[in-house]
Regions:
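Accessory, non-ATPase domains that flank or precede helicase/AAA+ motor cores in DNA-metabolism machines
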Residues: 1-291, 299-316, 326
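Conserved helicase/translocase motor-coupling segment
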Residues: 313-347
């Protein structure tokens, strides 16, 4: 057996061919983490192909020095190649994120349970390959994730690890087996009902995934700032296409990219918690004599059942002139229009 290896070397995005010793053959698979000799140095790397058709003769190949552990799946290798090309980066950075933090030589038992698909609009959306879930501002992630997880193994990506821990605990309480990334990488690779974590978990290993969910897909923390600068949304779409999983984006304020991708596959959740109303008040509408606040703001503030937030111009920014004593706004003596003070102190 011979393999193609991508070395874990900064600045190098080239693959090299190696022979596999007979003792290592049972352990080697696409994505396996190995150690090889390169330019008289011992370096780590990932197996990207087995028995490639254009390999040179085995007699001219150096042997792999060591099998280090189980690494990203073959599907992750393919997805990483596509994303790296799309965002003008190197695969090494992605495969490092997709690899376990500690070496894994063997996987635990598969802990997946049977799936019980339910009805409703989410079931229809799942059968169509997923879509956009337009939720309320404070939508509880657990409720929606439970509904989606009943269709099969689920990968959920949330903006913050704190949120991931909370949801993981609640999903375990609901009877699902859960892998919290990155600590439970080995269990995720073996098989669980729910895999959940922050941005990097979008590269988590999956066994026969049914759904991939990106929660709060509009959140900027789901953008990778290091090269390649991928977005979790793009990776989820790519991996869903490669695995046949349904892809869901959940957000109270969906991004234009998510709306365009959904193409009408939109489900509005039953959460009634929506954004509060925003009003822009023209201070001149109250007439020539006004105070620092409009009459509409004062009326709303008197209602003790409401919480009102007022955003006003900071001192020194407003260019209108108001009398300090009578609060009259300076107006043109001919047409009664409001006047502003220019930089040379003229009206």
């Amino acid at each position: 057996m011979n393999v193609r290896v991508l070395p874990d070397v900064s600045g190098l995005d080239k693959e090299f061919d190696y022979a596999v010793p007979e003792s290592m053959v049972p352990s080697i698979a696409v994505g396996a983490m190995v150690r090889v000799e390169l330019a008289n140095r011992r370096v780590d790397g990932w197996v990207t192909a087995i028995n490639p058709p254009d390999v040179t003769s085995n007699s001219a190949l150096r042997d792999i020095l060591k099998f280090r552990g189980i690494g990203p799946s073959a599907e992750v290798i393919v997805s990483a190649t596509t994303i790296a090309e799309k965002f003008m980066g190197r695969r090494r950075a992605i495969l490092t994120m997709a690899s376990p933090d500690t070496l894994v030589s063997a996987l635990p038992a598969d802990r997946r349970h049977a799936s019980y698909p339910g009805g409703g609009q989410l079931a229809d959306l799942h059968s169509r390959g997923g879509g956009l879930i337009w939720c309320g501002v404070h939508q509880d992630p657990t409720e929606l994730l439970r509904s989606i997880a009943r269709h099969g193994s689920l990968l959920a990506v949330v903006p913050a690890l704190r949120t991931a821990r909370m949801v993981a605990s609640e999903m375990r309480g609901s009877g699902f087996s859960v892998a919290l990334m990155p600590d439970d990488w080995a269990q995720a690779a073996a098989g669980v009902d729910v895999i959940i974590g922050a941005r990097g978990s979008v590269w988590a290993p999956m066994v026969a995934p049914s759904s991939i969910v990106v929660w709060d897909e509009h959140d900027e923390s789901l953008n990778e700032e290091r090269v390649p600068t991928w977005n979790t949304r793009d990776v989820a779409i790519e991996r869903a296409a490669n695995t046949g999983a349904a892809c869901f984006f959940v957000s109270p304020t969906p991004s234009p990219q998510a709306l365009e991708w959904a193409q009408g596959r939109i489900y509005a959740s039953d959460d009634k918690d929506t954004w509060q109303g925003v009003k822009v008040i023209d201070m001149a509408s109250d007439g020539p004599v006004i105070g620092s606040f409009s009459s509409e703001l004062l009326e709303a503030a008197r209602d003790r059942s409401k919480t009102v937030l007022c955003v006003t111009n900071s001192t020194g920014v407003g260019r209108l002139l108001v009398c300090k004593q009578c609060k009259s706004v300076a107006r043109c003596e001919n047409c009664d229009s409001l006047v502003v003070q220019s930089t040379d102190s003229t009206l």
